[in-house]
Amino acid sequence: MIEVLCNDRLGKKVRVKCMPDDTVGDFKKLVAAQTGTDPRRIVLKKWHSVFKDNITLADYEIHDGMSLEMYYS
C-alpha cells in the first residue's frame, strides 16, 4: 500500500492510500470520495504529463509519498 498526496494549488491537499496496481481511474474515485468532487472532473498531472485513466500507478512510476497536481475540468 502506498500513500500519494494530491494538491489542487487552491489550498486543498489530500492524502490517499492506494495500491500501486490501481488504475488512475480508480485512484481518481478515491480522491473524489475525500474531496466531494466528481471523479470525471479531476485531471491528475505531474509536470506537464496528464495521466490517463486506464494506466496503473505503477506504470507511471508513482511511488509512496509522491505528490501529484490535481486540476478540475
UniProtKB/Swiss-Prot annotation:
Protein name per its UniProtKB record:
Ubiquitin-like modifier hub1
Residues covered by the Ubiquitin-like domain: 1-73
Q: Which InterPro entries match?
A: Hub1/Ubl5, Ubiquitin-like_dom, Ubiquitin-like_domsf
Q: Where in the cell is it found?
A: Nucleus; Cytoplasm
State one molecular function term (GO): protein tag activity
Which BP terms in the Gene Ontology apply to this protein? mRNA cis splicing, via spliceosome; mRNA splicing, via spliceosome; protein modification process
Keywords, sorted A to Z:
Cytoplasm, mRNA processing, mRNA splicing, Nucleus, Ubl conjugation pathway
Domain of life (superkingdom):
Eukaryota
Q: What is the effect of changing M70K?
A: In hub1-4; induces arrest of cell division in G2; cells binucleate and septated
- Describe the subunit structure: Interacts with snu66.
